[in-house]
């Protein structure tokens, strides 16, 4: 949310979506945002902070008002300075969840390891931040109204050098995390399953393979690639 929040308008959106707007990103420095977070939460939305140059104090105000996560941590976010910790300082100091784009481009592998050490395995959520080009060949695509060029899997705005999301898939994110950290599948898998489910308060239904939960199953082969079986003989 890059405009001042309008809870009545958000209520209309939520009604039109049959209550399915579950997650929203806000920029803490936008006027009225910290004060509106409780109202967004009451509408059934989990609130993340991100796409922001907010200062430390304003970011903490949002966290204290109920923000539960940071959107693609480190990216599109004012970084830590020893005299001005900014939003990054509040995110690392707090116990909110941190999203991480683990494609090896948005975050250096060492940065991923640093984030895991700072927050712990139970507070990091691996995301893709993918655009429509995910899983497709290199070429020109659209991100909203902006043309995007994908070269060697790297998506950047056609006019400029800024990254425009990623082409990462969840399966590749899993393999990257295992490679970046040297940790086991069992240690890394919750970053893509349990943690997001817990953050969204749906862990009673999805996020792990337990009796009574939805059979939301992905089968991996020995190399941790998604195993798509062929048709029966």
Give short role names for the model-derived ranges.
Residues 1-15:
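Conserved phosphate-binding/catalytic loop of the ribokinase/pfkB sugar-kinase fold
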Residues 7-11, 30-39:
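N-terminal active-site wall of soluble small-molecule enzyme domains
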Residues 24-27, 50, 101, 191:
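Structural motif
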Residues 36-39, 49, 58-187, 198-203, ...:
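Active-site-adjacent C-terminal substructures of enzyme catalytic domains
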Residues 185-196, 208-209:
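Short, well-structured alpha-helical segments that form the helix of a local strand-helix-strand
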């Amino acid at each position: 949310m890059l405009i001042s929040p309008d809870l009545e308008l958000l209520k209309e959106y939520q009604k039109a979506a049959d209550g399915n707007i579950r997650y929203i990103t806000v920029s803490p420095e936008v006027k009225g945002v910290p004060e509106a977070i409780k109202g967004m939460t009451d509408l059934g939305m989990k609130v993340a902070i991100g796409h922001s140059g907010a200062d430390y104090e304003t970011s903490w105000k949002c966290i204290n008002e109920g923000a539960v996560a940071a959107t693609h941590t480190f990216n599109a976010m004012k970084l830590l300075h020893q005299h001005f910790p900014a939003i990054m300082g509040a995110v690392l100091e707090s116990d909110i969840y941190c999203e991480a784009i683990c494609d090896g481009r948005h975050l250096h592998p060492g940065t991923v390891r640093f984030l895991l050490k700072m927050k712990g395995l139970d507070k990091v959520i691996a995301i893709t931040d993918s655009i429509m080009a995910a899983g497709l060949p290199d070429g020109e695509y659209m991100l909203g109204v902006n043309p995007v060029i994908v070269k060697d899997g790297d998506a950047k705005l056609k006019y400029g050098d800024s990254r425009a999301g990623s082409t990462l898939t969840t399966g590749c994110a899993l393999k990257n995390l295992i490679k970046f950290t040297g940790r086991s599948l069992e240690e890394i898998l919750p970053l893509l399953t349990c943690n997001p489910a817990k953050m969204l308060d749906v862990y009673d239904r999805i996020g792990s393979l337990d009796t009574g939960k939805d059979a939301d199953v992905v089968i991996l082969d020995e190399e941790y690639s998604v195993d798509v079986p062929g048709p029966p003989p």
